Amino acid sequence: MIVVQVSDTHIKSKGKLAYNKVDIHKALYNCILHINNLKPKPDLVIFTGDITDNGTNEEYKLFKETVKLLDVPFYVIPGNHDNAENLKREFEEYDWFEENNHLSLVIEDFPIRIIGLDSSIKGKSYGGLSEERLLWLEKQLNKFPDKKVLLFIHHPPVKIGIEHMDVQNLQIGRERLADLLGKYEQVLALACGHVHRVSTTLWNKIIVLTAASPSHQVALDLRKDAKAEFVMEPPSVQLHYWTEEQGLTTHTSYIGKFEGPYPFYNEKGELID
C-alpha cells in the first residue's frame, strides 16, 4: 500500500504569490502531475494541513480545482492557516468528517487504517488536542486493535530544533497523546506537516515523521537566534509504503526534472566503471 502525504500547500487568492516570491499555485499543479506520474500508482493522497494560507472560500475553491486532477482518491485535514468552517463547507460533498466539533477522519477501505487527527485551534499558530479529540482517537483505536494504523496530524508533538517552528508545535494535549499512543501498538507512525521540512524523531517509542512542502521550505538553521526564513529547496512529497511482510517504509519523493535515470550495469550485466 502506498500513501502519499502532501503538506502545507498554502494556496492563496488567484494570482497571489506567497511572501511576494513563491508561486504556490504552480507548485500545487506540479505536485499533482508528479503524483499522477508515480509508478506504481498510490492508493490515496492525504493533505496534512495548511491547505490554504488564509482559509478563504476562494482559496479552497482554487485548491479543489487543482486537486481534482488527481488520478487517485484524496483527503484533507486542517492546519493552523486553515478555516475549519470554510474547509468543511467547501468539501462537504466528500463526506470525510464524522464529527461536528473537529475535522478528523478515518479511512477504512485499505489494508491499513488511515486516521487524520485535527490539531488546529482557531486563531492560533500552535496546535492542540482537546479531551474530546483525544477520546475520539481512543475510540477509533479501540475499534480494530489488530489492524495497523498510520496516523496523520498537522502539528508535530516534538521539537525539531528550529526555534521559531518549535514554539508553535503541538502545545496542548501532547503528554496525553503520548500516553494514549503508548497503549496501542498498532500505530505504525505519526506523520505530521507544519514545519516544511523532512525529519524523523523517536518520541516515547513512537516514530514521528514530518513532511516538507511542495512549494517552499523552512530554512534549516538550528541556532537559538535563527531568523524565521524560508528557502527554495527542492519541493517534495512523502511516500509511505507499507507491506505486510516488512511494515512501514517512508520515502521522500522530489518534485521536478532531474538528470537520469542512468543504468548501473551495461548490456552484459557488468557494473559500469
From Swiss-Prot:
It holds the Pfam family Metallophos. It catalyses: a sn-glycero-3-phosphodiester + H2O = an alcohol + sn-glycerol 3-phosphate + H(+); sn-glycero-3-phosphoethanolamine + H2O = ethanolamine + sn-glycerol 3-phosphate + H(+). Its EC number is 3.1.4.46. GO terms for molecular function: 3',5'-cyclic-AMP phosphodiesterase activity; glycerophosphodiester phosphodiesterase activity; metal ion binding. Keywords: Glycerol metabolism, Hydrolase, Iron, Metal-binding. It comes from the Bacteria. CDD domains: MPP_GpdQ. Catalyzes the hydrolysis of the 3'-5' phosphodiester bond of glycerophosphodiesters such as glycerophosphorylethanolamine (GPE), a typical phospholipid metabolite. This is Probable glycerophosphodiester phosphodiesterase GpdQ. It comes from Arcobacter nitrofigilis (strain ATCC 33309 / DSM 7299 / CCUG 15893 / LMG 7604 / NCTC 12251 / CI) (Campylobacter nitrofigilis).
